Amino acid sequence: MITCFIRYEIDPCRKDAFVEYARNWNQVIPRCGADLIGYYAPHEGSATTAYGVYNIGSLAEYETYRERLLADPLGLENYRFSQKEKFIRREDCIFLKPVSAPRGAPG
């Protein structure tokens, strides 16, 4: 399993648009084959940093997942929404693998 961390730099005056965008992914991401951990919008501290986090089995599964995202009507609509509204200033993606067990889990 690998975890994808998406870091967004968003327009702080358009946080509401980012929240709508994130809520749409709540439906699309699981439907397309990834395990959505969640989307996180600014609360305290930086008003411009947001995150999306999901798990996927492998990079090969990620490629299939991306194809499904591009074919999903709501996924495509959400992408167009972000392009039209321009509330995302920058988006970076990194894939990480777990190297320790969660606290309290046998390790």
Q: What do these predicted regions represent?
A:
Residues 1, 72, 84-107:
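Intrinsic disorder/low-complexity detector
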Residues 20-37, 55-92:
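An amphipathic, aromatic/His-enriched active-site/gating alpha helix that lines ligand/cofactor pockets
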Residues 14-15, 59:
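Residues at or immediately preceding the N-termini of alpha-helices
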Residues 40-41, 97:
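Residue-level recognition of beta-strand->loop/alpha-helix junctions
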Residues 45-48:
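Short acidic/glycine-enriched loop/turn segments that link adjacent beta-strands
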Residues 2-7, 18, 29, 50-53, ...:
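Short, structured motif recognition centered on aromatic/hydrophobic residues
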